[in-house]
Amino acid sequence: MKVLFAVSECVPFVKSGGLADVAGALPKELALLGIETVVMMPKYSLIAEDVRRRMVKTAECEVRVGWRRQFCGIEHLEHDGVSYYFLDHGYYFNRDSLYGHYDDGERFAFFSRAVLEALYALNFEADVIHTHDWHTGMVNYLLKEEYRKKPFYQHMKSVFTIHNLQFQGIFPKEAVHDLLGLDISHFTTEKLEFYGNINYMKGGIIAADQVTTVSPTYRDEILTPYYGERLEGVLSDKKDALTGILNGIDDVLYDPLNDPHIDYHYDAVNRDGKRKNKAVIQKTFGLPVNEDIPLISMVARLTKQKGFDLIKRVLHELFEEEDMQLIVLGTGEAEFENYFRYMEHAFPDRCKAYIGFHEPLSRKIYAASDLFLMPSKFEPCGLGQLIALRYGAVPVVRETGGLHDTVTAYRETTGEGNGFTFAHFNAHDMKHTIKRALSFYHRKEEWGRIVQKAMTHDVSWALSARQYQRLYSREIKGEAHVLK
């Protein structure tokens, strides 16, 4: 079986969010299952220079962008048993950020068609083309509407994964012709039209043979108006080919027993290193070094979606009622960045914030934390809680999306559960759950069992990769759609 991953970002090359982690880890796991997996992505100037120097030009192709024709270089790099092809176009991809440019519609129209042209240039006859989020949704659409008419592409199946439905790639209707090179018949409600514009995410959904989301609960949520982002009708029409497959993390990369970024290593059986890491991070941030004070952390974008408005409502109360410390790492909305700067000043022995992102520091924080707070308004899957489980930072989460699928509430009567959860997006429900978690922290023997359950929870890609393998196989064979 041959599978092509078409992605807009991928670790270890470039990353802006969780999509890059999936693109970096899942192909490796599929390769271990004997699937020939190739990844295609843009050759951004943001990729480290030493990595770009190792790329080898292997082919080139011409790509239609509306009425124009653009040159595309194709460069190859082998990494961790996976072949990566980087599609090169200096004007589109030599930018100071991955996204957020005035011509993103054109950039990813080019990339989507370039992916299909590059397949032919490389003579790579993929059985399945697997695309991700709006940036590559037009790959699925162009394959179905145009390229499958050519013998080289006619047997190829396509899968489209929704990582976050909130970001859809919406552009003026002129893009149908001027960027995608399609005629106006594609601007209908049954095709690309979306409230007077065109929608790349919608195109990927309607054209793919299979659509997946990054958790089973998120799959069900996006069929409702609350989570559906005005695409719930389109998704409902596709629900027989809509599957939720839970993301994992790279458990070799995220391993407290071997992580080069942390000061002391440990595992689920011997957690003495975790205690030492806590003292290191308390000292680093200028907090009182005290093992008996529970340390809570948040590593996230500082946005309302991540629940920071809930934090803002009750953090004062928590500091007044509980002996606890909080470390926050992230950037985001100015309202929350300024709030945590104020809280650092108001509670210098309780609250510290690093406004920015620093991967090695984030690992140190996970390894030091007793609790990890993630009260998201919605969360398609979530990466933070998976890393937290792996590092023994017991998650406190809202029951939504992938948080619901990965964190189970601790039950005192049975000893089951790997974290603490609350259902409603409500500040005082969150506060009550945090206080409950803190009460168990001081019962050392019981707390040790909770931490061990967290650390032994399987967060790897192994099971999910087998589910994708099954999905691909069933689609290639033309069998029933939804995985049961």
From Swiss-Prot:
Record field: catalytic activity: [(1->4)-alpha-D-glucosyl](n) + ADP-alpha-D-glucose = [(1->4)-alpha-D-glucosyl](n+1) + ADP + H(+)
Domain of life: Bacteria
InterPro entries, sorted: Glyco_trans_1 (IPR001296), GS/SS (IPR011835), Starch_synth_cat_dom (IPR013534)
Pathway entry: Glycan biosynthesis; glycogen biosynthesis
GO molecular function, one term: alpha-1,4-glucan glucosyltransferase (UDP-glucose donor) activity
GO biological process, one term: glycogen biosynthetic process
Alphabetically ordered keywords of this record: Glycogen biosynthesis, Glycosyltransferase, Transferase
CDD domains (alphabetical): GT5_Glycogen_synthase_DULL1-like (cd03791)
Function, as annotated: Synthesizes alpha-1,4-glucan chains using ADP-glucose.
Recorded family membership: Belongs to the glycosyltransferase 1 family. Bacterial/plant glycogen synthase subfamily.
PANTHER family listed in its UniProt record: ALPHA AMYLASE DOMAIN-CONTAINING PROTEIN (PTHR45825:SF11), GRANULE-BOUND STARCH SYNTHASE 1, CHLOROPLASTIC/AMYLOPLASTIC (PTHR45825)
Entries under NCBIfam families matching the protein: glgA, PRK00654.1-1, PRK00654.1-2
Protein's UniProt name: Glycogen synthase
Gene: glgA
